[in-house]
Amino acid sequence: MNLDASDYFYDSTDGLRLYCRIYPALRTGGLPVLCLPGLTRNSRDFVALAAHLNAEREVLTADLRGRGRSAWDPDPSHYQLPTYVEDAWLLLDSRAIRRVVVVGTSLGALMGMVMAAMQPDRIAGVVLNDAGPEINPTGLRRIAGYAGKLPPVSSWAEAAAQAKSTYGIALPGLTDEDWLDYAHRGYRENAGGIPVPDVDPKISQAFTNPSTAPRDLWPLYAQIKGVPMLVIRGALSDLLSAATVARMVREKSDLEHITVANRGHTPLLNEPECLAAIDAFLARYGETAAHGD
């Protein structure tokens, strides 16, 4: 496992300073991997996966605007899928990356689907972590209930307890040490040394604005059937149903898919079955260098 990485900042078209953590390839040849996080999450969720993958390829783990070390947007109406996708393309262009494999968790998975539809020649494959063209309203309501709305905590122990309370139903079996690590990935210390969620609370406005609410994405899925895809579903997921995955397979017979036991929304991508599936997917679709034109 290689943890060597560097900080990379770039500017959005509307002037926000955005952040990406870059794990350089130890050996060249493989396509870069772009990791895109879930709604309230950030690049730190991909540390283990990036360290696993960068033996053979560069790995970019992005903080979406309003998360992590990326700037908060003064206009919360920009916290929506088209803006995030535009930022992702800008990141790739700023690094002169012509072709990439996208690994997206939840919101990041939807970003990967949109990117594949927009420029399929640049997307060699997409790994969809517990999201697809149909979103279960039950899971969406649960996420809307906590996104940007968590009560304050006063210590890292309380942050870990809050993380367990919020996500424990999706991640049974994690130890207290695991939950503390999970908290450190989703919280940061404010000026007073108190842990706070590492996200702009105004991202939750996307759930109350009809123009930014998730749409029927089956037509989008139909557009990208030619793009290789791997779907990772948590067996306990309340966002991506088994029925949705079954329909995805019916409509795209070469769709690769696995179900991860004892995981809901979302698998952590450090599970052995996830790593094995991603490794196999990259061996098939991610083995050509793609920097420059």
Q: Which residues fall in each region the model found?
A:
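Alpha/beta-hydrolase fold catalytic core
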Residues: 1-33, 56, 97, 273, ...
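Active-site loop/oxyanion-hole signature of alpha/beta-hydrolase fold enzymes
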Residues: 47-51, 61-103
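Short beta-to-alpha linker loops that shape the active-site pocket of alpha/beta-hydrolase fold enzymes
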Residues: 63-67, 132, 263-264
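Conserved hydrolase catalytic core segment
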Residues: 98-137
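Conserved alpha/beta-hydrolase catalytic His-Asp/Glu region
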Residues: 154-211
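Conserved serine/cysteine hydrolase catalytic core
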Residues: 190-250
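Catalytic histidine-centered segment of alpha/beta-hydrolase-like enzymes
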Residues: 263-272
